[in-house]
């Protein structure tokens, strides 16, 4: 997980999964890595992980990405498309000030390198279990935005990695009960 920098344009100080917008470069990367430029969102996930926390998803592992050329390990051993399982997609409701269409991917890994925050978008980066993150949120130690909260809640319910990789989270907008039950910070950026 990352904690966004306090000067981040959207949800500063919130804890989130590494990620960001699909850039123009992602379709060509998707063509190169996955054989299909329509997989630009999947390529963006790989690129953002390397840029924000210096982790490169390769064919066999998740490795430390070099500061200079963080995608070099990916170019050398591209991951197959199925290595990154799409588990959720969240689209911002119209009332959200910053529009997003966020796709969440999971990747299997054994003994991955430690994440290193880039300092520009990620102030902090660390490995944490979904249940521990929800406990930190309940203790008001971290801020979670609703797509992250809903995704982490679904991940915490998985019994094992196989169940997690078969997961397809129902994407929806928060209902009235949730709007009233959760702290305001889950739904609205007040900072």
Which ranges hold each PLM region?
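Conserved Nudix-box catalytic region and its N-terminal flanking loop in Nudix hydrolases
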Residues: 1-72, 131-135, 139-143
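Nudix hydrolase/Nudix homology domain
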Residues: 15, 24, 28, 66-191
